[in-house]
Amino acid sequence: MPKVRTKDIIEQFQLELVSGAEGIYRPITTSDLSRPGIEMAGYFAYYPAERLQLLGRTELSFYETLTPEEKKSRMERLCTDITPGIIVSRGLEVPPELIEASERQSVPVMRSTMKTTRLSSRLTNYLESKLAPTTAVHGVLVDVYGVGVLITGKSGVGKSETALELVKRGHRLVADDCVEIRQEDEDTLVGSAPELIEHLLEIRGLGIINMMTLFGAGAVRTHKRISLVVDLELWDPEKQYDRLGLEEEKVKILDTELPKLTIPVRPGRNLAVIVEVAAMNFRLKRLGVNAAEEFSARLSDAIEDGAHDYD
């Protein structure tokens, strides 16, 4: 099933449907828009017919200089069986030749009162959001001090319990158990909860808890950009864990790499506090403060000074 149809665009931007009503269920498969200026001049060799077509004052003022035969020909070639729609901006008058051609090909022709550039920008942002690559990850997403922290790990390791403690400490839950992730940009991943389990948290022994009902609207968020991955794993005595923080792990989700911390779980460790500190430390690093690197530099200086003393 297509993610976006022309009907969705009409409803989202309150567009006036002028003609071609039979085609409002056509799928929109790309976030790219086309302003067919060169096509108005008669060059259709590289006409991107699969895109939404946007006609502004520039295109329509040139169109008015054409002969009646040219006008009819241009609009007939503009309306194809794969064109999802044609939008006229600025509330301009829709050419009768376009209405006739669109009715024959069932191409929706819409009109907006917005300026062309603003409409183009808003359409692109909307389509990029809706058509972005998506995936689902088993984990919990929490907003901790403004940092989107994705908590992962095997079932039963304590992800939901950690999220519950974080919410109790004033942070906000985004999703539990299943996190839907969409890639809105090359380096931007946004996580949200499936509609069915939105605001719900499952705790073994307690069952399902509605966090918004229990803690209020301030305890939940609908979506959040993911900045950090915290992987919880049962403590393995055979494994060497990072104790300085100089080595930064990365994990790839879709086409975006995110910093990852592996936190060993054992009785007595307060995981919620550790996740809080991890989020604060992440913010510090973004501000250019890296405690591990500063300690390493001081240690190197001390060793070097000690070596000189022995000399």
From Swiss-Prot:
Binding-site residues for ATP, renumbered to this chain: 153-160
Domain of life: Bacteria
Pfam families: Hpr_kinase_C, Hpr_kinase_N
GO terms, biological process: regulation of carbohydrate metabolic process
Keyword set, alphabetical order: ATP-binding, Carbohydrate metabolism, Kinase, Magnesium, Metal-binding, Multifunctional enzyme, Nucleotide-binding, Serine/threonine-protein kinase, Transferase
Name this polypeptide is given: HPr kinase/phosphorylase
Record keyword Ribosomal protein present: no
Region annotation (Important for the catalytic mechanism of dephosphorylation) ranges: 264-269
Catalysed reaction, written as an equation: [HPr protein]-L-serine + ATP = [HPr protein]-O-phospho-L-serine + ADP + H(+); [HPr protein]-O-phospho-L-serine + phosphate + H(+) = [HPr protein]-L-serine + diphosphate
Binding site for Mg(2+): 160, 202
Record GO terms (molecular function): ATP binding; magnesium ion binding; phosphorelay sensor kinase activity; protein serine/threonine kinase activity; protein serine/threonine/tyrosine kinase activity
NCBIfam families cross-referenced by the UniProt entry: hpr-ser
Free-text comment about domains: The Walker A ATP-binding motif also binds Pi and PPi.
Stretches for region Important for the catalytic mechanism of both phosphorylation and dephosphorylation: 201-210
Entry similarity comment: Belongs to the HPrK/P family.
Transmembrane parts of this sequence: none
Gene name of the record: hprK
Its biological purpose: Catalyzes the ATP- as well as the pyrophosphate-dependent phosphorylation of a specific serine residue in HPr, a phosphocarrier protein of the phosphoenolpyruvate-dependent sugar phosphotransferase system (PTS). HprK/P also catalyzes the pyrophosphate-producing, inorganic phosphate-dependent dephosphorylation (phosphorolysis) of seryl-phosphorylated HPr (P-Ser-HPr).
Subunit organization: Homohexamer.
Active site: 138, 159, 177, 243
Enzyme Commission code: 2.7.11.-, 2.7.4.-
Principal EC category: transferase
